[in-house]
Amino acid sequence: MQIRFLGQSAFLLTSGVHQLLIDPFIAGNPKSPVTLEEALGWKVDAVLISHAHGDHWGNALDFGRAGVPVIGTAEIGGYAQKNGAQNAIGMNIGGTYRAPWGSVTLTPAWHSSSFPDGTYGGMPTGLIIEMDGVRVYHAGDTNLFSDMRLIGDRGLDVALLPIGDHYTMGPEEAARTLELLRPRVAIPMHYGTFPVLTGDPQVFAREGRARGVDVRVLAPGETAEV
């Protein structure tokens, strides 16, 4: 699997002929390495949304109106459908959606969720994605919580974790989650996009590697092979 970091919490996952786009904050993202026009040209199987805040919901409707399935909570699915997405799939925490590309399971996250227009976005979530035998946990926006151990019990290959502080956990707390999640590889996200997100990825890398985890710090546009 190739995991391409697109800035903030956006990632493009590629495995064989399949591609998934997570939290597609592209237009308006000062760290995005691609334009929205470029991204809309990708052959994406689905767009996965952790929660409804603008820096995660992002350009979901642009993809949804172009026919790409938009997957998230029931509230996110309903909002997407109401606003022109051709194939919106609403789920809830604990549920799994299966497709030819693999599966996604929604997990809890400790945060909040509302759309840019103020509409309630349901519960914030994390995402466990399985593609071709690789299991990736995208934590969304969250703090450390003890039930991360249960997520780790599923056997994670990769954890994508917010480290920016202020709205989520900072780098030291994010490193502590690795003791519960126990992934092979960890990649930091949700930092440096705006001045308030001061978490240092090198602190996370140092603390994570001290716990025996392969931490990979990606610049926007860079790709990790896992």
Curated annotation (Swiss-Prot):
Molecular functions (GO terms): hydrolase activity
Name the record gives this protein: UPF0173 metal-dependent hydrolase Dgeo_0136
SMART domains in alphabetical order: Lactamase_B
Residue stretches in coiled coil: none
Keyword Membrane: no
Sorted UniProt keywords: Hydrolase
UniProt keyword annotation of Phosphoprotein present: no
UniProt superkingdom: Bacteria
Family named by the database record: Belongs to the UPF0173 family.
